[in-house]
């Protein structure tokens, strides 16, 4: 799921419930929680278990300022004792082996912060507590998404623990993901920004692993995918929320199409579903006439 605030869930903040809304086809679903207070995290996991959720992921890697300012996300590496107290509470609520943890390398580089390379302390401690798996984005929190993900740390983590290790960071294409598997020995990868740019990245990944050449979507296929995405968004959400999401998502995965600058602008400016379809149709007609 998207990141869900444990406190927001307990206090029933507007919109929180929609973040873990799902359907049978989604299974198995892993609920991604964040928060820096053990009682709230334990209570949130307990509530979600009562709703039938089984798997959880604790985000200790998000470096977005509004999350880190609360002591959550990547800021948890600044207080190892509290991070482990939160982990213990979550595992107590969900069960051993049912909670994963996302980590960064640390808050900053050695010499710049006392919370440097905290992953080396957290990883084995989380394994001892009963974590089910670990995900590492091999950048510091201060880096955000700048610089280059240092995949060599993924190999080190894999050697340090016996848990499944998931790689994150600079996985923009399926080829990146498969190369990361080969170079680091991790168990699998987690696509984030790469999936926002190309929703078909997961199928392409499986194709490459199976020795098949991934399909390269032409414009007609991509537009059909956008319309299907819009249909599902409207079916699974309110009309207003679905349109807002499509206005945010679609421009990312049409960016590589030649001549799509105006389409991106038109999608972002949409105020209704009629506007949305008109933008697609105008672009489609323009492409057809130029071929």
Regions found by a protein language model. Give the residues of each.
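Flavin-dependent oxidoreductase catalytic cores
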Residues: 1-291
């Amino acid at each position: 799921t998207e990141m869900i605030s444990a406190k927001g869930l307990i206090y029933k903040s507007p919109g929180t419930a929609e973040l873990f809304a799902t359907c049978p086809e989604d299974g198995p679903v892993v609920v991604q929680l964040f928060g820096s207070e053990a009682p709230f995290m334990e209570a949130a996991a307990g509530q979600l278990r009562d709703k039938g959720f089984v798997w959880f992921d604790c985000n200790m890697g998000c470096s977005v300022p509004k999350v880190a300012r609360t002591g959550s996300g990547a800021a948890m590496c600044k207080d190892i004792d509290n991070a482990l107290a939160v982990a213990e509470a979550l595992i107590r609520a969900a069960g051993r082996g049912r909670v994963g943890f996302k980590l960064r390398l640390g808050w900053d580089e050695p010499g710049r912060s006392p919370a440097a390379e905290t992953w080396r302390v957290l990883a084995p401690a989380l394994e001892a507590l009963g974590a089910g798996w670990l995900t590492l984005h091999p950048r510091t929190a201060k880096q955000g998404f700048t610089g280059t993900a240092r995949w060599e740390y993924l190999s080190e983590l894999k050697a340090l623990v016996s848990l499944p290790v998931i790689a994150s960071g600079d996985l923009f294409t399926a080829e990146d993901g498969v190369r990361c598997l080969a170079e680091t020995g991790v168990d699998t990868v987690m696509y984030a920004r790469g999936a926002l740019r190309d929703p078909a990245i997961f199928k392409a990944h499986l194709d490459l692993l199976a020795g098949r050449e991934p399909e390269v979507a032409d414009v007609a296929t991509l537009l059909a995918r956008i319309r299907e995405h819009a249909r599902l968004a409207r079916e699974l959400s309110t009309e207003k929320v679905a349109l807002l999401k499509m206005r945010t998502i679609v421009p990312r995965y049409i960016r590589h199409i030649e001549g799509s600058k105006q389409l991106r602008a038109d999608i972002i400016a949409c105020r209704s579903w009629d506007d949305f379809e008109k933008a697609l149709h105008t672009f489609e007609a323009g492409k057809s006439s130029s071929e």
